Amino acid sequence: MHDNDVNPLKLVSKLGLNRRQFFAATTGVAAAVTLTGTAAKAAPGANGVLIPAPRRGIILYTVRDAVGRDPLTSPYASGFKEVLTELSSIGYRQIEFAGLRQHANAEGGADLGTVAGATQLRAWLDDLGLQAEGNHGSVPSTITDANIAAFDTACEIANILGMGHIGTGSDPTSSAYVADWEAAAARWDFYGERASRHGLKLYTHNHDIAYSFLLDSGPLDATGRPTRSSGIRRLEHFLANTDPKHVYLEMDIYWAHVAQYKHRTFTAPDGSTVQSVFDPAGLVAAQTTRYPLFHAKDGVKDTTQANGYVMAPFGEGDIDYSTFLRRVGAKGSHNPMWEQDTAPGGSAAPGQSLEFARVSYANMAALRG
């Protein structure tokens, strides 16, 4: 039997810790965390469920320690089958993969990214009442016959798994320059159209840098590149220059709020400093159907940190998910995947990521607006 049934609230009491001390000890969060969780608070007069039960999801990167550990040496849930069983019992119904590899000793072997492996994985998903929604794989960096063939194979695997989406956890490019973003847009249009032929939506992900400002104007540097900005954010330019029928976005809401905190000013062509505060929900609301997936990642405000936030279980941070989900429109049609990069507790707390999965699911279910 796998020992994954520790109630985190009982553990807090047993250890004589308050919730702030508990999360500081287990995740390095040094800021206060409330017992009820900011995200789980309903707005006055609002009582509608914001994330319907069939759309409460998780990306397996959050529990990567559990997927990757050796079942022969650990008493905890290990490998895809056992971890998916645990997540299903918690209540999750959607799964986003972060690759298709697990520990070699887990049932099914190390690599399930084959036709046989995906068929086995699909059987487990179906048995557990889980729906695969997407995968953080890779979108080829060039358009070649070999890369096209590899992408088609990835789409075939996605279809075996029953996914509606296929994507990546990386930004389309790390460049600050228009030419590179337009090249990325052309490449994504190509592969997005190809994904559409397979019945899939191709999506990209964001980190905070993707919502910083393009360098697209002003004096040129020694290499002939612009040094100032017109105020357009990188991923906004990408969105405007890709085909909405073939290219979609998964907003990582935590990183979008980090961008709101960090990327607030730009140097205009005339050399003046201009303030422009990013509005993540407003951006989504303008084209809400282009954002079929979210990373529902929470964070505690901490201005001593460069990012302005420290990651926390969903509902235990300061990102106002009730307001965000109300503002973006198309209520109940998005697919929020809970993610917490810092959930794995290492050898000191091997059951932590799955415990945080329980806490986060409860807060997702309680969210009203």
Kindly label every feature range from the protein language model.
Residues 70-86, 144-156, 276-283, 321:
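Short, acidic/polar
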